[in-house]
Structure formats: structure tokens, C-alpha cells
């Protein structure tokens, strides 16, 4: 008989409740290359030993339940159970531990981020024996990675489509995010693109509201793209948000974008859901559309240090589900992001192979093999004075997105776009000449203002603007 259906002779069924650690805490277990490995930050309830808490996480996120059941005898628990194979205290925190759990690959449906999360985090976070629980990191084995298509195109294919190399890409979120008519919205897009930006963007909550229905917005934005391309000789794009109330409506919007011939669409992957996102990513690959991903709602899940899911896990999940861009924080702007930790998950988005590095919050070595990379998008409270730091921190393979930092220019959208493009080109040239952007950044920007009145005006407006708050996302 196969191990799945084997009934164990001579083993009597004993009803009752027993400690999880007797079955699910296995410190001698040697992890397999095919296991999915998880690092959980566990805060047990008073009186619950850390080994029992870690074993409870392994049990409740795999084969276990609160009591012994007779049907355990109809399967092979050793084959299918999750195992807590390590416990370590969290430095500087009282009663917090990192519990390492290994899951057999047979527990997961191929190519389904939805199923992976339903299994690993679907139920266990409400478990009473735990005061708090946070999923810090996952190691996705190569065998599972290969069941995913991943990003529709990836970094190199995107550069080839846009014919843009050797620098970060520049974007802008159209503001005000809500309330503009479709025609005025398209006008704002055109002015930004003709001023020198590569992309403009729908904000995450621009879908199809009474003041601007999606079809009207798509048409006016497409007109703006083609007009700006004709004037500048550069390929332009606007992230047309296809997020909708149903998957069918989302696909209808993506199909219309393809018919218009625009290069890129957008999806809110957490509010829209992983199933919808993966479906859209498959369509985008099959039809030559780039896919920009917004992470709206992420801070609800990832901001608390002791409970939830760290964004590095959500970033890995997005790379598997599919997206060519994703917002990643800025380090220097108005939104959350500590430098080393942010760069840790930026590498997890872009690189093929990432070594374990606890100083950056990376708990496991991750091999993505042939899965395409994702461009990180720095967006939120950034302006021209931040350009040297952003160029130095994120490098060429990134999108730098200035919403208010473009549209807030005193002379209008197009001069705001000019200011950002001049600042970026000055920083890239200075870096290529061997200058230190971190040390000489302000001087580089001041030198560039001599040749660009638009940049000089932007520098004057935002010279005092800073967002200096302590990051919550620390090790």
C-alpha cells in the first residue's frame, strides 16, 4: 500500500490531547532542498514554552489540530507534517523567539501563491497559545519556484521594450488622485511625459468612479502617450490601473489597454488578491503588456514588528505571482523603510541568487533560478534634492516616482518633469565620472541648476522639506 493510504497495524487509537512538541518539535531534523522553510517571530502566551509555541505553529499550519483524531492512522504524518526544527531568542526582546519551520513540498499546490499563504498563514495567526506571530521570511525551494511563471517580462525585457538603458526610470503619480475628469487627467499625463518622464501612473484607488470612468481615462491617457511620444521621440507609458471588483472586469480592462497599444497596465495585488494577480500576469506575458504592481494595504499586514507578515515575504510572493514593478519604499521619503532592510528585499526582487544575511533581515539563502526580476519602485514624498541618494541607493534597475515632486512644481507639470529628468541625468553622469553621490549629492544638484531654470525653481521650493521619523521596520 502507498504511504498515503497505509493503515498502521498494531497501533491503537488513543483519543485525547497531547502537547504539540511531542510530534512537531524536531530539533534534529535535517532540512531538505525541497522543503519550504519559514522563519516566524513567535510571542508565546505566559506559561507557554517556546518549543511548544513553535511546534504549535508547525502543527496548525500543516497537518495538526487541537486533539488526536483517528484518521491520523490513515496517512503518514512523518511525510506530511510541518516541523519546528529550531528556536532562537530575539536579541533585545523579552519573550520573543524565532521559530524555524520546515514544510514538505507535497503540502502545496503547484503555481499557487494563494494556496501557499492559505496553508502557512491562513489559520495559525489566531491561535490562542500565541500572543503574537509574525512571518519574517520564507525560503522557496527551486522545485517550487519552477512551477511559477513569475513576472510577465522582467527587467531586461522591459528595458528592451522601452529602449532605455544605463539609468533608473522616472515616473509620476497623477495628483490629485481623485476628482479629476478624464480629459483633465489625460492633460496632466501628457504634460508630465513631454517634460521628460518615462511613465505616469494611476493612483492605487483610481479604478472606475463616477467622476472618471475607466474607459474614458484609458482613451485620454492613450492619446497623451502617443502625443508625447511623437514630440519627444521616446517610448512613454502610463500605468493604467486595471484593478476591478471582479476578475472578469479586470481582464476586460487589460484587454482594452492592449487594444489601445499602450505598453503597461497596473494592479493592486493585495487588495485584488493573488489569484487575480497571477491571472493578470499570465495575460500580460501572453500579450506583451508590462505589469506595474501597487502594494496598497501592505502596511496593515507588515508594519507591526511582532505580528503580521514582513514585506520581504510579500515581495517574494509577488515575484512568484507576477509583476514587473512593485513599490518598495524610498528610505528617504515619507513612507516606511529602513535602509538595510529595504535593500534586502530589493535584492530579493531583482537578483537571481541572494545569500542569507541576517544584518539585512534575510533569514535564508534564496535561489530564483530563471525567474525574471522585478523593478523596485521608490515612491512617496520624494523630490529633486533626494535624487542623488535615490540613485546611489537603488542603482539603475529601479523606477523613481515623483508625484507631488513633479506636479507641485511652481511652473506646472512639464517643468516639474524637466526638473526631475535634469536632476537624474546629472546624478547618473556624476556617478559615471566617479563622483560620490552620497557625499557630493547636493553640490551635483546645485551645479545642474545653472543649466536648468526648472530645476532651480524646484530646488528652491523643496529645500526645507524633510521627513525625519524613526523607521518602524528595524531588526
Swiss-Prot record:
<keyword id="KW-0934">Plastid</keyword>
<feature type="modified residue" description="N6,N6,N6-trimethyllysine">
    <location>
        <position position="14"/>
    </location>
</feature>
<comment type="similarity">
    <text>Belongs to the RuBisCO large chain family. Type I subfamily.</text>
</comment>
<feature type="modified residue" description="N-acetylproline">
    <location>
        <position position="3"/>
    </location>
</feature>
<feature type="site" description="Transition state stabilizer">
    <location>
        <position position="334"/>
    </location>
</feature>
<keyword id="KW-0456">Lyase</keyword>
<feature type="binding site">
    <location>
        <position position="327"/>
    </location>
    <ligand>
        <name>substrate</name>
    </ligand>
</feature>
<feature type="active site" description="Proton acceptor">
    <location>
        <position position="175"/>
    </location>
</feature>
<dbReference type="InterPro" id="IPR036376">
    <property type="entry name" value="RuBisCO_lsu_C_sf"/>
</dbReference>
<keyword id="KW-0488">Methylation</keyword>
<keyword id="KW-0560">Oxidoreductase</keyword>
<keyword id="KW-0460">Magnesium</keyword>
<protein>
    <recommendedName>
        <fullName>Ribulose bisphosphate carboxylase large chain</fullName>
        <ecNumber>4.1.1.39</ecNumber>
    </recommendedName>
</protein>
<keyword id="KW-1015">Disulfide bond</keyword>
<keyword id="KW-0150">Chloroplast</keyword>
<keyword id="KW-0601">Photorespiration</keyword>
<keyword id="KW-0602">Photosynthesis</keyword>
<feature type="binding site">
    <location>
        <position position="203"/>
    </location>
    <ligand>
        <name>Mg(2+)</name>
    </ligand>
</feature>
<feature type="active site" description="Proton acceptor">
    <location>
        <position position="294"/>
    </location>
</feature>
<dbReference type="GO" id="GO:0016984">
    <property type="term" value="F:ribulose-bisphosphate carboxylase activity"/>
</dbReference>
<dbReference type="GO" id="GO:0009853">
    <property type="term" value="P:photorespiration"/>
</dbReference>
<feature type="propeptide">
    <location>
        <begin position="1"/>
        <end position="2"/>
    </location>
</feature>
<feature type="modified residue" description="N6-carboxylysine">
    <location>
        <position position="201"/>
    </location>
</feature>
<dbReference type="GO" id="GO:0004497">
    <property type="term" value="F:monooxygenase activity"/>
</dbReference>
<dbReference type="InterPro" id="IPR033966">
    <property type="entry name" value="RuBisCO"/>
</dbReference>
<dbReference type="GO" id="GO:0009507">
    <property type="term" value="C:chloroplast"/>
</dbReference>
<keyword id="KW-0007">Acetylation</keyword>
<dbReference type="GO" id="GO:0000287">
    <property type="term" value="F:magnesium ion binding"/>
</dbReference>
<keyword id="KW-0479">Metal-binding</keyword>
<keyword id="KW-0113">Calvin cycle</keyword>
<comment type="subunit">
    <text>Heterohexadecamer of 8 large chains and 8 small chains; disulfide-linked. The disulfide link is formed within the large subunit homodimers.</text>
</comment>
<feature type="binding site">
    <location>
        <position position="177"/>
    </location>
    <ligand>
        <name>substrate</name>
    </ligand>
</feature>
<dbReference type="InterPro" id="IPR000685">
    <property type="entry name" value="RuBisCO_lsu_C"/>
</dbReference>
<keyword id="KW-0503">Monooxygenase</keyword>
<dbReference type="InterPro" id="IPR036422">
    <property type="entry name" value="RuBisCO_lsu_N_sf"/>
</dbReference>
<feature type="binding site" description="via carbamate group">
    <location>
        <position position="201"/>
    </location>
    <ligand>
        <name>Mg(2+)</name>
    </ligand>
</feature>
<feature type="binding site">
    <location>
        <position position="295"/>
    </location>
    <ligand>
        <name>substrate</name>
    </ligand>
</feature>
<feature type="binding site">
    <location>
        <position position="173"/>
    </location>
    <ligand>
        <name>substrate</name>
    </ligand>
</feature>
<feature type="binding site">
    <location>
        <position position="379"/>
    </location>
    <ligand>
        <name>substrate</name>
    </ligand>
</feature>
<feature type="binding site">
    <location>
        <position position="204"/>
    </location>
    <ligand>
        <name>Mg(2+)</name>
    </ligand>
</feature>
<dbReference type="Pfam" id="PF00016">
    <property type="entry name" value="RuBisCO_large"/>
</dbReference>
<feature type="binding site" description="in homodimeric partner">
    <location>
        <position position="123"/>
    </location>
    <ligand>
        <name>substrate</name>
    </ligand>
</feature>
